[in-house]
Amino acid sequence: MSSSNRELVIDFVSYKLSQRGHCWSELEEEDENRTDTAAEAEMDSVLNGSPSWHPPAGHVVNGATVHRSSLEVHEIVRASDVRQALRDAGDEFELRYRRAFSDLTSQLHITPGTAYQSFEQVVNELFHDGVNWGRIVAFFSFGGALCVESVDKEMRVLVGRIVSWMTTYLTDHLDPWIQENGGWERFVDLYGNNAAAELRKGQETFNKWLLTGATVAGVLLLGSLLSRK
């Protein structure tokens, strides 16, 4: 698949923002305007004799070189299938754990100065004893909720940063596991065609299927982690 991890993150975040009446393209345009303004100021500094500016050597995200993602390695599955499966799984995750998930995001009390620390704390706890597909779904859902919370609290500037943090973590920490466990093809096999919702309607044991090793107790643990100030 030719889609990058960043494109997958943006699609999911854009979808979550749209559910709350927000528009990703508007946020992206604002971010680009801020970037252009900063670049102009930096170029002015160069023209005024500053030796500190250097053109970027390559594509980086938050200082980390972007490697080939598992989406690029596994080219059989269609990008649209992965995106739709991830959207559906995220919706089902949030439906099942709406209260715990709402408590989690509301307890963050994020600010531009503390957002990364909060993101890192929750994500590290989520994957502290391993990776599985359910936790990857939870990771995307958390990042999407954090973006929505940022916009709701008039901190729109954080959305682009959160997307970059998610992309970096997905590329650096989750891609190896994804590649070793069937790639995104396997994810689509498990979660495609709104499989999570169908299992719930069929009264299957949803917890064991979606959040293997990351059950409700694990979600609540994240909430208790954030309540320890």
From Swiss-Prot:
Give the UniProt entry's GO cellular component terms: Bcl-2 family protein complex; centrosome; cytosol; endoplasmic reticulum; mitochondrial matrix; mitochondrial outer membrane; nuclear membrane; synaptic vesicle membrane
Pfam families linked: Bcl-2, BH4
Q: Which InterPro entries match?
A: Apop_reg_BclX, Bcl-2-like_sf, Bcl-2_BH1-3, Bcl-2_fam, Bcl2-like, Bcl2/BclX, Bcl2_BH1_motif_CS, Bcl2_BH2_motif_CS
Example GO molecular function term?
Answer: identical protein binding
Classify the protein's membrane topology as the record does.
Answer: Single-pass membrane protein
**Keywords in alphabetical order:** Apoptosis, Cytoplasm, Cytoplasmic vesicle, Cytoskeleton, Membrane, Mitochondrion, Nucleus, Synapse, Transmembrane, Transmembrane helix
Expression by tissue: Highest expression in organs with lymphoid development.
The sequence motif named BH2 is recorded at: 176-191
**Placement of sequence motif BH4:** 4-24
Major location (coarse): mitochondrion
Q: Name one GO biological process term.
A: ectopic germ cell programmed cell death
**Segments carrying motif BH3:** 82-96
Residues spanned by motif BH1: 125-144
Give the SUPFAM superfamilies listed for this entry: Bcl-2 inhibitors of programmed cell death (SSF56854)
Tell me the domain of life.
Eukaryota
**NCBIfam families cross-referenced by the UniProt entry:** bcl-2
Protein function: Dominant regulator of apoptotic cell death. The long form displays cell death repressor activity, whereas the short isoform promotes apoptosis. Also acts as a regulator of G2 checkpoint and progression to cytokinesis during mitosis.
Provide the domain comment. Answer: The BH4 motif seems to be involved in the anti-apoptotic function. Intact BH1 and BH2 motifs are required for anti-apoptotic activity.
Q: Which family does it belong to?
A: Belongs to the Bcl-2 family.
What protein name applies here? Bcl-2-like protein 1
Species of origin reads: Gallus gallus
